[in-house]
Amino acid sequence: MDELNNGCSSFRLWESDAPGHKVGLDVPTLRYYPASHKVGNGTVIICAGGAYQRRSPHEDIGYAEYLNSIGLDAFVLDYRVTPYEFPHALLDARRAIRFVRKNAEMFGVDPNKIAIMGSSAGGHLAALTSTYKNVIDGEGIDDIDAVDFMPNAQILCYPVLDVQGHKYSFEVLLGERFEEHKKATPMLLADENTPPVFLWHTATDACVDVNGSLRYCQKLHEFGVSIEMHIYPVGIHGLGLANDNEHNCPYIQGWANKLEAWLKEFNYTNS
């Protein structure tokens, strides 16, 4: 465990090299942001967006600080991006959930109240983690991998859910294996066992088509999965909390309050 400058702690997800590690490239880590005044024992693992090319800070640290402000511990997953390809980011997300669940007592969280949250391509990763059930090469190497990897809930912000939504994210994720995109498409993998979802999007998102979110929630509804969806009539892509100088949209800021109420409904907080 390493202490970071802002007071949070950073954990390597594997003690030795991660499966598929490339020398000189990113090491997948999990940054822990504990709430100073906890009001519940749920927690959220955050995956920033960035088309699998980078990770956008306003969609990870910003979310962590917001979750801390409502009394929840949060984790930011520094998952692997290009030149890594599928399934490395998924492997990292599964490992993060297993790591937190394995160490739930140490973190003071309920192992059955671990949500995964993501925006844009990070939303794709969160949804894929919630729907992909096949074993991945590199799993099963230690006792952490024996722990269940499925999150208990998914929080999706303007997510990429299929090729129609944002083809480029799939091209970066899959590289020369783009023709295999169906195996990495949450829309096609969802079933009656998919975790409950909170999702928001804007109807005028010119980057990631809102219709993917509509189709995903419709499919989950047909399977009997609990959904809460908010579609705002106007708004650009990548707003995050919609409250900073670059992404300021007061009307859309209300999604965070709706998320807080949803988390309370599912007993992640008790405020």
Q: Model segments located where?
A:
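Short beta-strand element of the alpha/beta-hydrolase
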Residues: 41-49
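Catalytic nucleophile-loop/oxyanion-hole region of alpha/beta-hydrolase
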Residues: 55-57, 62, 75-111, 248-252
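N-terminal cap/lid segment of alpha/beta-hydrolase-fold proteins
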Residues: 1-39
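C-terminal catalytic histidine-bearing segment of alpha/beta-hydrolase fold enzymes
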Residues: 31, 214-271
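Short beta-strand/loop motif that positions the catalytic acidic residue
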Residues: 199-201, 205
